[in-house]
Amino acid sequence: MPGKLTGSSPTTTAKMKCGAVIVAAGRGERLKNTTPKAFIPLRSKPLCQYSLDAFLSYPKITDIVLVIPEEKLSSFSDPKFKVVAGGASRQESVFKGLSALECDTAWVFVHDAARPLLTADLLDRLWESAKNGKNCIAAWPISDTVKLAQNTTIAKTLDRQNLWGAQTPQVFLTSVLKDAYAKAKKDNFTGTDEASLVERLGASVELVVGDPWNLKITTPQDLKLAELILENKL
């Protein structure tokens, strides 16, 4: 049975434990590269290494699970984090990572390794919201005019004033996210992010202002842009 969606937030030291699931099992066909996306080099480091470094250096995170393609399992051997094989879909991969967290992990940060420019400032903003028992995601207000299309014809212009682009990390009470995955499996539902699963439980999810540079690497152009951003930061 699903647990309660609301209630007192964890207060003891044991219950303040935070974990992170870094999803790095995607193939990245749109990058036109035979290497799994998270292992494509960005300034000489694998893409997933940037997210790993961000979470390893963030003191509130005590349990990290990296989810990667099965054939890459031998690429990492480090006692500071766990490595598990991904599933057939992103949703299955996140669930495998979630299942590998220590059982007393109260909160979980779920992050796409395809977003390598994660900062400690963004992690701080998310934790400030999450530590009071809230579920929250990083997001950025949409500035473009958004068209709802039917095939290639405009069906409607949406009011962008209330539209946000979801990012990661997304942070949840671990018990709530597990309940959300149980319901999704029961209903045979596939969502595009974790928040969409939690929303189906009736649980609230807060938007935390993300970072305009927290881009998702999807195309070769995105990879080049990330390189330029890193060059200017260094």
Regions found by a protein language model. Name each.
Residues M1-S9:
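Short, positively charged low-complexity motifs
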Residues L73-K80, L148:
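Short loop/helix-cap segments at secondary-structure boundaries that form the rim of catalytic
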Residues K15-E71:
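N-terminal glycine-rich phosphate-binding loop and ensuing alpha1 helix
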Residues I22, C48, G97, H111-D112, ...:
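Residue-level signal for inorganic ion chemistry
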Residues P2, W164-L234:
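Conserved alpha/beta core of the MobA/IspD/sugar-nucleotide pyrophosphorylase nucleotidyltransferase superfamily
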Residues D78-R90:
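Conserved donor nucleotide-binding strand/loop of the catalytic core
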Residues R90-T153, Q167:
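Conserved beta-loop-beta/alpha segment of the NTase-like Rossmann-fold superfamily
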Residues K156-A166:
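A recurrent flexible, glycine/aromatic-enriched loop bordering the glycosyltransferase active site
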